[in-house]
Amino acid sequence: MANIVVVGTQWGDEGKGKIVDLLAAFADLVVRFQGGNNAGHTLVVNGESFISHLVPSGILQGKMCLIGNGVVVDPAVLTEEMAALRSRGVAVIPEKFKVSASAHIIMPYHKTIDLVREEAKGHEKIGTTGRGIGPCYEDKVGRNGLRFVDMLDLPAFREKMARQVKEKNLYLERMFGAAPLDVDGAVAEYVGYAETLAPYIADVSRILADASDEGRQVLFEGAQGTYLDIDHGTYPYVTSSNTVAGNACCGSGIGPRDLSGVLGIVKAYTTRVGEGPFPTELFDDVGDFMQRTGSEFGATTGRKRRCGWLDAVMLKSAARLNGLTGLAITKLDVLTGLDTLEICTAYRYQGKTLSDFPADVKTLSQCEPVYEAVQGWQEDISGVRSAADLPDAARRYLDRITELVGVRVDIVSVGAGRDQTVVINNPFA
C-alpha cells in the first residue's frame, strides 16, 4: 500500500493535474487538501480538454474523489463544475465524490471583499484572483466561518448566514463605500446549494481511515505551488493556505505515518502569474518562445504567465520543505529547439553568493541568477515513451537537475496528452 502526495515545487502551474490524472490509475482515492477555485488543472484525455478547479482530477478515472477540510469551497463553482463534468459523461455522484463536513464555504461577501480590497491597494496589488479565498480563510481563522456541516441544518444555516451577510455589509459600506449585498437573495441562493450538495457532505477523515484499514491506496492532490505557501512562499505574494506536503495531513484529517512519499512537480522551466519577485524571469525572445510554445496562460485567470529559466535554488529548497522523494518534470518538450539551456545554480546578492532561497522578497528581488549552461536539443520528443529514447542532451539536462536538487526524476512529461509521458519510477509501484 502506498499513499502519495503530489505538490508543485514552483509558483503553481507546474502541470500537477496531468500527473495526478496519470497516477490516479494506481490509486483508489484522490484527495484535494488545500486551496480553493483559485487554482485550475487542465487535462487532455483522448484529445479532449477538461479544466477542473475543485473536483479532484481523479474523477476522470472513475476514482473516489474527496475534498478535504483544508479546502475552501465556493458552492456556486462546485455545483457548476459538477454539472459540466456530468454533461460530458463523467460520473459525479455521491458514491464517487464527497466534500468534508469541516470544509469552509466561500460566501458571496468573501468575493466582494477580495475585489474591493485589491482595488483599494492600487499599485500595491498582490495579484489576487478575486475569488474570495483569502477572506474565507480569514473568517476560518477568526472563527466566523460557515462550514459544510452547517448546511445540514437549514434553519440554523439561514440564521447564521443572514447574520454574517449583515455584518459584512456594514464592513463593505463603511470601509470601502461598496454597495451592500442582498441578504435575502444571498441566503436563498446558498440554501439552494445546500439542498443540492447535502448528499455529498461527509466525514472525509473517517473515509480515509477506513481506506487505510482496508489497504487501499490514496493520492493527495495539492494545488498552487511551494512558493505560494502562506508560510514558506514569497510573502506577501502568496496564497492563503499551506501548499507544502505537510498540509496533506492537516487538510485531509490523517496522520503523518499514513504518507509513503511526496512527488514534486517541476516545470522544465519556470513560470509565474501575477506580482512578486522572479530571479530567472526572461524578457527576451527566449521568454516569448517559452510563453508561446508552452501556451502559458492561467487555467483559472487566463492571465499570461511570466517565463524564465529553471531555478535549482528554489527547487532544492522546495525539496527540503516538502520532503520530496521524487520529481516529475513537465513540459520538457517546450524546450525543444533551443540551442542552449540555462539552469540557475545560485544567486548573487550584494557581492555575495547565496545557495539558499531567501525569505525576504526585497532580498529576492535584488538577487541576480548565477547560470550554468547546458546543451539543448533539436529532436521532437513528443512521441518518446522511454527515457532511453530521449536525446542525449535531454537526458543530461534531467540528470543535472537530479544532481543539483538531490532528488531523482521519476516521471517526465513530453506533451499535454495523458499518454505523452515517460514513467521511469512509478511512485505507487
Swiss-Prot record:
It is an enzyme of class 6 (ligase). It is found in: Cytoplasm. Pathway: Purine metabolism; AMP biosynthesis via de novo pathway; AMP from IMP: step 1/2. It catalyses: IMP + L-aspartate + GTP = N(6)-(1,2-dicarboxyethyl)-AMP + GDP + phosphate + 2 H(+). Mg(2+) binds at residues 13, 40. One of its GO terms (cellular component) is cytoplasm. Its cofactor is Mg(2+). The active site is at 13 (proton acceptor), 41 (proton donor). PROSITE patterns: ADENYLOSUCCIN_SYN_1, ADENYLOSUCCIN_SYN_2. GTP binds at residues 12-18, 40-42, 305, 331-333, 413-415. Its main location: cytoplasm. It holds the Pfam family Adenylsucc_synt. GO terms for biological process: 'de novo' AMP biosynthetic process; IMP metabolic process. Substrate binds at residues 299-305. Coiled coil: none annotated. IMP binds at residues 13-16, 38-41, 129, 143, 224, 239, 303. Homodimer. Plays an important role in the de novo pathway of purine nucleotide biosynthesis. Catalyzes the first committed step in the biosynthesis of AMP from IMP. This is Adenylosuccinate synthetase. It comes from Desulfosudis oleivorans (strain DSM 6200 / JCM 39069 / Hxd3). The gene is purA.
